[in-house]
Amino acid sequence: MRFLVLTGLSGAGKTTARGFLEDLGYFMVDNLPPRLWPPLLQEAAARGLARVGVVVDARALAFFQDLEEVLEALRPTVVYLEARPEVLLRRYNLTRRVHPLGAGNLMREI
């Protein structure tokens, strides 16, 4: 089974990448705590799924204390997305959404 962890900067394209991965046949889950990844993979294997991915978002970091331990045990492919600050700023200005890491100076938060 292929197991992928998709993460990166807020506004860097995780939602778009998730859609592409789903189009490639990945079963994707958002912000599932790492301690639940092994049961997810067991269930996926039992159902014959060949590709599973999880999206890790900065807003869910409180649930990710055991991330390093689980990454070592499962050895997933990790995809980290980033973009230039001016691109992130433009995307947030287009969507008019509040940056998930703070409502202060947007450029500083990026």
UniProtKB/Swiss-Prot annotation:
ATP binds at G8, L9, S10, G11, A12, G13, K14, T15. GO terms for molecular function: ATP binding; GTP binding. Belongs to the RapZ-like family. Pfam families: RapZ-like_N (PF03668). Keywords: ATP-binding, GTP-binding, Nucleotide-binding. GTP binds at D57, A58, R59, A60. This is Nucleotide-binding protein in fmt 3'region. It comes from the Bacteria. Displays ATPase and GTPase activities.
